[in-house]
């Protein structure tokens, strides 16, 4: 059924590809172009990025546009001159892997971003993008163009293709890519038994579906038990988009990033770590430890990623010695920076090289601390080269120092924001960084009863539906990983659509109901959390024990009426989550009708919100078959409007939905009330409530008991290929691995 749905969704595929050529870039001035036309231009620029463009209009604009002759059409001519000088000296060659944490690569990418960002209008922006599309490295172009679409005001409303559709290589295992190339080279003409063993299905519509689970597993550590979570394509997209929203190199006020609550990116890090702990708890695994530089790194990692150059992402073996004579200088610098930051937190200030003081005393100074830890401080002189603590940590863990800042650098999983969450050591790095962050929080005064209380408001009841998770399937379009031949380039489409069928965590929709009584009509902020009840050893956890494990599921504004109020929230509408990102091909189907007309409607209110959020299916951890005991917490607090930080622009906060209710409530401290140590004598008030819940995992064994499954031709699969569904049933053809025909001669 899934394949039939895919075929139906691709039924208009030919007409879509045909009609997208009716939008001719460069034919007319594009300043007044509507948002969907702009979006189609961006989609064309990002299609099959590893090859020269297949579109004649892009190629024509790239040929005719001369940057030196149009210097007056850019806001900053010095930016243009610097790029031209760099381009003439030589840039990262086309075909090489772009690494956005490599200083040489990044320096060039920032110059590419600046020249596109400084274009005076959308017409100049697109013409510059076309010129760059045909001349610079494809990965560098995608990175700079994505940053521009995120931050240019005339790009608001544009929906970008998911990064795993633009460059699938770093989101799927190498065996998927290998099988896709095999199918393309043979035009899907393979032995049916081999196709069945590989988990490949081919339809008459040239749709090739490759099952991710049929690949051989490489298991190094117990961390691989939760790889379904850490290697989730949407989770890694979230991390990549978080970086694109707040790039550490983007320090100039002209980009407006310093007008947001940028420092609370640290709150996102703490929430990711808490989410990991809940996932580990589902498998009865204890918390990870902060990385220690003087101890062997016991946890190795096998990325299973092959890049488009044919290079494999390096494998890190277990028990690796971190500090060697080659990287000892990096270790010393890291120690100095970390000591300086911790001393600054304890003393309340850090002195910069030019003599200015960075204060680290008040709650709002978290903005400064986060920039010091993760980059983006805008430091002067040599300060910026060593203040980025996370960058130094990653550099220390690289496989050697000889390839730094080289064009031919082969990245590790840590080097890319789109893959770093896959590596278990990155979570330990985050743990060490957040330890410094928590030291700052520890120095702040504890919340008082007045901070928690809401006089006249009482929560009477707090309930939720049954919480059930399961592992479902998702079909990911990996066609852009394939190279097109001359015939396909002329047709402007691939003859075959390649799809990777992946297993992913999901849960049934649920509702949360809160009954609140109020003695007055008043606006309020409702926060809903979920966290553990017991630790990994089965011990009951106190509020302070688990406060850093509490996940903020939802935060929203609500108007309480006098008397009883019943608040109902659906899991699909909770703040901070989005629905599944649609296929780009389906976006095109929605944009372009059968007559080639393009819809001009766009929900501008949700453009940023839909771009940078977690999928709703990851709200809950996996849980356990018999149920995993958890606790949910709700607190209703008044709206306060006197806490606006001086460097925030509330219009930007509202537009990007940085936190719920930002238009009227400036109290959006990440993690409140669990972000500081709690004085239990002042904590419990009438406007908050805990409730016990259970998270049940439904797997194949439960599904088989309620479905009519013919098991006469099936066998139980018990081997290293199956680690998610331990009781997966497969057809007998799985045993016929060595057969070269469909004749079943191995039967008894």
UniProtKB/Swiss-Prot annotation:
Q: Tissue specificity, please?
A: Fat body, and hemolymph of larvae.
Q: What InterPro entries does UniProt report for this protein, alphabetically?
A: Di-copper_centre_dom_sf, Hemocyanin/hexamerin, Hemocyanin/hexamerin_mid_dom, Hemocyanin_C, Hemocyanin_C_sf, Hemocyanin_N, Hemocyanin_N_sf, Ig_E-set
Keyword DNA repair listed: no
| Nucleus in keyword set | no
For this protein, what is any one GO molecular function term? nutrient reservoir activity
Instruction: State the conditions that upregulate or repress this gene.
Output: Suppressed by juvenile hormone.
Lineage, top-rank taxon, reads Eukaryota
Keyword entries, A-Z? Signal, Storage protein
Task: Write the signal peptide boundaries.
Answer: 1-17
Its family remark reads: Belongs to the hemocyanin family.
Q: Do you know which PANTHER family this protein is assigned to?
A: FAT-BODY PROTEIN 1-RELATED, LARVAL STORAGE PROTEIN/PHENOLOXIDASE
The protein in question is named Basic juvenile hormone-suppressible protein 1
Q: Which organism is it from?
A: Trichoplusia ni (Cabbage looper)
Gene, per the UniProt record: BJSP-1
